[in-house]
Amino acid sequence: PSLDEPMTTWYPDWATHGKGAITLRDVLEMEPGLAWNEDYDPANGVSDIVQMVAAEPDQLAYAESRPKEVEPGTEFDYSSGTAMLLSGVLQQATGMRADQYAKEKIFDPIGMTKVDWWQDAAGHTLTYCCLDTTTRDFARFGLLYLHGGRWGDRQVVPADYVEDSLAGAPNSPDLYGLQWWLDDPEGVPADHFSAVGHDGQYIDVIPSLDLVVVRNSTYVKDPGPSVADPNLFLKYPSDDLIPGKGTIPPDDWDESKTLAPLVADLTD
């Protein structure tokens, strides 16, 4: 589908709930205008992200139900709920779960062989998080984008989509594109972009240096099935007691401390 396809193509009831103008591009750019609170600290009350993860067996239905707050395309607001909407889009557009589609079209073609992408209790792939793989396989994904979506002699991701991904959203041109962060840590070239995951997972890509840097924290998935514990936050209100979590990065840990020395060595 076109990036400017209305989301009512996949969520037709939005047409009668004031959300008919929201496009797929708005969702990818985190600018759909939907109400959402991304506060992860349960001490501050039950935010949308806590509610979705802790109490909603069908996380996609919860994300879909969020009301419009502002006009789409007018404000950047990072939201796990917005990213979760992509799970429904992919499943309806392809007839496959998002993880199955990604395995066939992206992961297998680039050699990502050890991948586990979580689902909610209703069987929807968690497209806002929770893709477990190896550091080398994350690096493969970074290399795919470093090479403009091409892997060997195969164009795995359309080149024009890769270009759009890194162009910058209208209300966050130097911060966010289509599901990629575009901000530049101090001492790092301006063409840097990154994927940033939970608890210190990073894929940093710097095309001008032909460089991909992957950093994994010690986060380890809880043993058991690929389903997020619906009582995660309720059972473990303290952030450092949530099972499956590893060391917590210090408050002042930023990408520049990892990337800047590497960049300096490469450019000396």
Language model regions located:
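Amphipathic alpha-helical interface segments
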Residues: 44-66
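Solvent-exposed, acidic/flexible segments
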Residues: 4, 17-21, 52-56, 75-83, ...
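Structured C-terminal helix/loop/strand segments within mature extracytoplasmic catalytic/sensor domains
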Residues: 195-268
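Solvent-exposed loop and edge beta-strand segments that line ligand/cofactor-binding
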Residues: 70-78, 126-132, 195-202
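Active-site helix/loop module of the DD-peptidase/beta-lactamase fold
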Residues: 1-35, 65, 96-129, 133
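Flexible glycine/proline-enriched surface loops and loop-helix/loop-strand junctions
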Residues: 44-45, 66-72, 82-84, 120-126, ...
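Alpha-helical scaffold elements that line and support the substrate/ligand-binding pocket
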Residues: 1, 27, 76-106, 138-144, ...
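Active-site Gly/Thr loop motif
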Residues: 114-115, 163-212
